[in-house]
Amino acid sequence: MGGKRLPTVKPGGGGGNGNGKWSNTPNVGQPDTLKEALGTKGKPMSVYEAVRGANPYYDGSYKEFSENCQRAVIATEARMRGYNVTAQPTYKGDKLPNTAYVNPKTGVSSAFWQGAFKGAKQEKTPTQASVESKMKEYGNGSRGILQVQWKGGGGHALNVVNKGGKIQYIDGQIGAKYNGKELFSKIKSSRTQLTRTDNLKFSDRAKKSVEVAGSRTNSKKVVAL
């Protein structure tokens, strides 16, 4: 699968379009421990494998798996580390999609999804050039999560990868990637923040975001884009 390429889609489709509804499908309980959530570590997955399998129950008609980007980014990162996991769904009253704190001096915010990592730190990256400069500074093979706000309303989180010096904007929620120039034309640049993730350890709170692939039996599987 290493040679396969992700489909490139128009920015704005991830993060839910606000038209989804809550399903009547019973949710599967969260794993009790981080070890249970991650399962056994295997061979790191390619970008293609990680992204295409991160959120297999995606369905734009329902909120659970079309507004769970805060979990899909964790699943995508975990898969690139070698864990065969998928994203858990969001749910009514879920706090993970929310902003936890905004520094009044710097304007840099902290999001609840960051709790899946130990020592996660967001940096303001208001332009495509600033994101790519940071990623190149981190080095080949580095990975991060980009938090954005769409100009049309709503927010989103996606993964960023430095592969051979080329920066890729990948979206495990919908199983696709974005053109960087198009992406930045659709987002509020002042609200864009980058968190490096490849050098961080998972915290116990990551168990709220991922589950071993195939452990969910009460959901209809929907193939991503």
Regions found by a protein language model. Name each.
Residues 1-80, 95-97, 196-225:
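Low-complexity, glycine/serine/proline-rich disordered segments
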Residues 38, 42, 55-58, 117, ...:
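Generic secondary-structure transition motif, activating predominantly at the C-termini of alpha-helices
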Residues 48, 57-58, 62, 83, ...:
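Sequence-level detector for tyrosine residue identity
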Residues 70-138:
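Compact soluble domain cores
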Residues 121, 129-225:
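Active-site or metal-binding loop neighborhoods of secreted/extracellular toxin and effector enzymes
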